[in-house]
Amino acid sequence: MIAHKPCIDKAFFGRRQGKQLRSNQLTSIKTLLPILNIDLNKPAPSDLTSLFTDLVKEIRLEIGFGGGEHLCHEMARFPQTGFIGVEPFINGMAKMLMYLEKYTQHQNHLRLYDDDATYLLDWLPEESLNGIDLFYPDPWPKKKHWKRRFINVKNLDRFARVLKKGGKFRFASDIDTYVNWTLYYFTNHISFEWQSDTPKDWKIPYPLWPSTRYEAKALRENRVPTYLTFIKK
């Protein structure tokens, strides 16, 4: 097994920190994150629900939760769902930890990961997730950088491996080229079916969608969000 080193070190901060953290945020990074962070150096449990303190009925993954607006909203809506949140940027992780310090009950059905989501996807057991959310990922708008986009054949294979049959992959973006890119890859993948009846469905937010600061900015700049859902066959 490849050893995964903790990311809370000088390299992590130099690469992934934006604004300077407040003292209480630094404290949570040092004390609460090690408790909730998934250690990939340990074998994945055969029953992934054992990761959580609370008894959970299903498990969902959010990749790149940013400031945590959507993930916090979903945790409050679904207290019997276990959530795994991935965010490699320290400022977003710090905001999430501040929320968890205030709403301590959610610590019992949330686990975190602060590095590359592909490492976590490779660690997870087969068919262990009920859903995966990827909202407003970095679009890498320059064509020469499109190969860096998170949606690619290898990652779709990863999603297919860890999702249960009938599990949902949800994707939102305000960048047309990334929406088209995502549709192309998913509709050409043997393991996924696009859940849409009419083009109008693309523009309808998910039920009780809380929106995010990034989405609000996109709307102010006249970029129209698109919401896609794909089902694991």
Curated annotation (Swiss-Prot):
Q: What does this protein do?
A: Catalyzes the formation of N(7)-methylguanine at position 46 (m7G46) in tRNA.
> What pathway does the UniProt record associate with this protein?
tRNA modification; N(7)-methylguanine-tRNA biosynthesis
Where does the record place the catalytic residues?
A: D138
- Residues recorded as binding substrate, renumbered to this chain, are K142, D174, T212, R213, Y214, E215
What GO annotations for molecular function exist for this entry? tRNA (guanine(46)-N7)-methyltransferase activity
- Catalytic class of the enzyme: transferase
Enzyme Commission (EC) number: 2.1.1.33
Instruction: Work out whether the entry's keyword set contains Acetylation.
Output: no
Q: Name one GO cellular component term.
A: tRNA methyltransferase complex
Pfam families given for it? Methyltransf_4
Q: Which domain of life is it from?
A: Bacteria
**Name of this protein:** tRNA (guanine-N(7)-)-methyltransferase
Residues binding S-adenosyl-L-methionine are E62, E87, D116, D138
Q: What UniProt keywords apply to this chain's record, in alphabetical order?
A: Methyltransferase, S-adenosyl-L-methionine, Transferase, tRNA processing
* Reactions mediated catalytically: guanosine(46) in tRNA + S-adenosyl-L-methionine = N(7)-methylguanosine(46) in tRNA + S-adenosyl-L-homocysteine
